[in-house]
């Protein structure tokens, strides 16, 4: 567990759910879940995975390192090539920054860099840059389609907003969807420290860490997400 923000729990085989902590080791068979408004980061020697809020994942005992997504959303670092993700509907492998979201008996896979492979019912599709596919129960992957148009951020934008630790900053954007996914990332990482679903066009964010952060949003309709927006900047200072 490389990072824990909010309420994150871990369950070992045969055990009960208990509070997770940063730097806690994970073993095959362990399960991790995030409560609403919370984010976790799973770190491996060659990659990292952001687990969005309201999600549950499990490390499976397979020949290839396998992470099972039961529900919710994960965002896989671009450097990954040795990890596969499975859901009840699909198997995801390959390379490049990839998001996998499962809800309502369907799995959506989006590839930001290209290179993700999605397999179901004996059929395989390879996703290009900013392409996505949906896999429904007992069906093959749908033909890859371009991810929808990105929302537009309003504030803060390219000019950084300076705030103190835990001071509120209101994020605003516009787009046609009624639901969105918000990500906040440190300036030097592609793995989010905040990864949450929102049903609004603004959000009051409080960051407990010093440093410079980027934020972006993607529209969502069910499990399907749009391209992410451009990025705004937030600088958290001591005073």
Protein language model features and the residues they cover:
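Extracellular fibronectin type III
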Residues: 224-236
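Short, solvent-exposed loop/linker segments at the N-terminal edge
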Residues: 161-165
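Beta-strand signatures of extracellular beta-sandwich domains
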Residues: 9, 181-185
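Conserved aromatic anchor
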Residues: 167-177
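Surface-exposed, short loops/turns at beta-strand junctions within beta-sandwich domains
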Residues: 204-212
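Short beta-strand segments within Ig-like beta-sandwich modules, predominantly Fibronectin type-III
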Residues: 193-199
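Flexible, surface-exposed loop/linker segments and immediately adjacent secondary-structure boundaries
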Residues: 1-159
